[in-house]
Amino acid sequence: MSDKVMQITEKSVQAKGICKRYKSFFGRSATILKDISLDIDASEIFGLLGPNGSGKTTLISIFSTLIYPEAGSLSILGMDARGNRDAIRRCINISTAKPNFPWSLTVKENLRHYGMLYGLYGAALSRTVQDQMEAFELSEFQDHKFEDLSTGLKQRLSLAKAMLNHPRLIFLDEPTTGLDPDISLKTRQLIRRIHDEDGISVVMSTHYMPEAEMLCDRIAFLRHGSIVALDTPQNLKRHLKLGERICITYQGEADISALQGQPGVLGLKAENGRMEIAVDRGEESLDGIIKLFSGAKITDIEIKEPDLEDVFIELAR
């Protein structure tokens, strides 16, 4: 275990009763977050999931001390967020979903600018900037102005900037938004590396379910500003009793009413000669289900494990 890992406190985030409201131009108050309480271990990659408008970005903004809540207590890396904002900011960083940098500066100039804000100078600054440009494949674009970059390149620049101060805790808001598949994969590999090898705590929001399942040790699912589920991806799937999916492609007629009453069947949907049946015992249920397709010709059968996207759909209802 590295010295950096040993230095990290047991909890990266401790939140209790966090509430946030915004006022509209008409003076009306809208509640964005309601009574958010959770502890995030420094040893984990923690995911925030939920539909648009559920409060994920607002919560990350509060955790990263960009804004304050109206109510509740918050501790970051063992420090009270109210009285230690400067000390906390020296230990954390953030990559936003919609990066915004000085438009007239080049990639390299932007990284040097932020590096100096983080206290880097001389050879250390040059080396760190070069390392991050190489890590996020920005070297060939180092002389390109920010205003000329694609969405994906802007996102990669934001990630590179977030690593300049060697943070103990990093907040990632939709870290792979706008990235090509190969760069998305490399970004996920980098997130895993900086957590596993450098001992950096990671709190991230994402809409990409396979990404959350691949990276996150635990997940909080937000809906209408409240946490409606908090657990590991595996336990979320188990507790919601989503079951396995038997997917059958067929020609002809199937006895749908009999299928709905079949023991072990949790639900089904049929469309254009393909039926997806949720069951609590996949292979054990298969023989009884196939018998109810006696009047049809089955052309394909597939048994699928439930994934985090199934959890997302179930919790978002």
Labelled PLM ranges:
Residues 93, 112, 116, 123-141:
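Conserved ABC ATPase "signature" region
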Residues 170-173:
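Catalytic Walker B motif of ABC-type/P-loop ATPase nucleotide-binding domains
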Residues 4-15, 21-35, 84-85:
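A short, flexible loop at the N-terminus of ABC-type nucleotide-binding domains that lies
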Residues 189-280:
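ABC transporter nucleotide-binding domain
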Residues 51-55:
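Walker A (P-loop) phosphate-binding loop of ABC-type ATPase nucleotide-binding domains
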Residues 166:
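Conserved catalytic motifs of ABC-family nucleotide-binding domains
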Residues 72-80, 87-88:
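Conserved ABC transporter NBD signature motif
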